[in-house]
Amino acid sequence: MLPEQGPQPSTMPLWCLLAACTSLPRQAATMLEEAASPNEAVHASTSGSGALTDQTFTDLSAAEASSEEVPDFMEVPHSVHHKINCFFYLEKQLCQLPSPLCLSSLLTLKLKTTVPAPGRWWSFQPHKAFPLLVGTPGSWQSTIDPAWAAPSQPSPG
């Protein structure tokens, strides 16, 4: 066996790309954790090209000023909306990765951050899970292999 050496010059771009892509999910998780503190994490992470505007963030002042009694499960703290905005920003960034890495990172991010609504079942709807990636429901269905997407039916016999 040859002694272990560092990456060869011809493979350096591949190593750099791999390192950048593997750090994105970790950055995503860190940003989502930091998102509990209002607006600072997202504003810091969105400065630059493709940055979100302040209009993207949900203003809850009207909801908080409401005198109506809201059941506990309906109350949505500001940090939850902030995390949702973080998620969509990260989704937009992850969609710029090469396809396999993009799908893997998005699915990991989605599974770690999605909780079903009270009384609902877990479900996976690609057009809702990854709207920036797959677009409208009609467009994503045309890209799926028909054999894979066919409904499962018991085989006769």
Curated annotation (Swiss-Prot):
Localization per Swiss-Prot or TrEMBL: Secreted
Keywords from the UniProt entry: Secreted, Signal
Principal location: secreted
GO cellular component terms, A-Z: extracellular region
Domain of life: Eukaryota
Signal peptide: 1-30
Name recorded for this polypeptide: Uncharacterized protein UNQ6126/PRO20091
Organism: Homo sapiens (Human)
Lineage: Eukaryota, Metazoa, Chordata, Craniata, Vertebrata
